[in-house]
């Protein structure tokens, strides 16, 4: 006999609550509606989301797609009971990967999977996704909520995001004219962003701290809230600088793998990025992680962003103008180094000086 007292099993008896899913959809409709933009003004609930490239102003576009997740930063959100910002991280990780190719983010879809659906928790998560979409200027045109009993324990859940953007043909980055002597600018990160959290959690465990403990590196905040500071979204300032200065040659989103894995992805094989580590203003969270965990400088550089979330490559004569344009849009910009010649087989990122850890 089912839990409802009737003969025969129901989907609810198997752990899937369709009514909870419907309630979640109703809760998130205003947030989703708030992300509408030219090209996307439909309602959620259809079998697929629509986007009109002509209505968005494109004439001969190249589509650019990216997908990503939030990693084990989610575990902190789950354990701390703070779910309203990880959606911003989800969007940021995808749309920042689009803008580095010169593409304007247009649409976003999310995948939210959990063992037992909590409509309030889900609404908080999707509210963060919608906030990230508004900041990036892209429409949340659909998604999938999957309640899967037995697949996730306790209140665990996972998120994945999918973003599509576009650039007019011939305007994609990196440009083909990166040259020796070009200047490397760095845009400040908001914190750890969404990479390296397995190491972060290990360090916190070794320190014997709970997520509700005062953050040793952020006055007035709990450790959980401070570490959950959402990933910075660089889309609108970078798109404006790309269009107005026409001087950006390459961009690199500093994610997993840090400088040594991400910068070379946008460079020709004969050039390397020479970074003066002393020019980086290192946020206190990274100093705390390094000292508390005994993490060496090179390990920090290949695990975390260390205070720089985005790299910008420009010709030396345009560096000041590009920096000023980005600063006018609220970015904190530092001149980090320059492009140098690279021997075959040599690393694509080399360092001078030391980090201020």
Swiss-Prot record:
Location(s), subcellular: Cytoplasm
UniProt catalytic activity: 2-formamido-N(1)-(5-O-phospho-beta-D-ribosyl)acetamidine + ATP = 5-amino-1-(5-phospho-beta-D-ribosyl)imidazole + ADP + phosphate + H(+)
InterPro entries for the chain: PurM-like_C_dom, PurM-like_C_sf, PurM-like_N, PurM-like_N_sf, PurM_cligase
Pfam families on file: AIRS, AIRS_C
Biological pathway: Purine metabolism; IMP biosynthesis via de novo pathway; 5-amino-1-(5-phospho-D-ribosyl)imidazole from N(2)-formyl-N(1)-(5-phospho-D-ribosyl)glycinamide: step 2/2
Gene Ontology annotations of biological process type: 'de novo' IMP biosynthetic process; adenine biosynthetic process
Annotated EC: 6.3.3.1
GO cellular component: cytosol
Catalytic EC class: ligase
PANTHER family: TRIFUNCTIONAL PURINE BIOSYNTHETIC PROTEIN ADENOSINE-3 (PTHR10520:SF12), TRIFUNCTIONAL PURINE BIOSYNTHETIC PROTEIN ADENOSINE-3-RELATED (PTHR10520)
Protein name: Phosphoribosylformylglycinamidine cyclo-ligase
Source organism per UniProt: Allorhizobium ampelinum (strain ATCC BAA-846 / DSM 112012 / S4) (Agrobacterium vitis (strain S4))
Source lineage: Bacteria, Pseudomonadati, Pseudomonadota, Alphaproteobacteria, Hyphomicrobiales
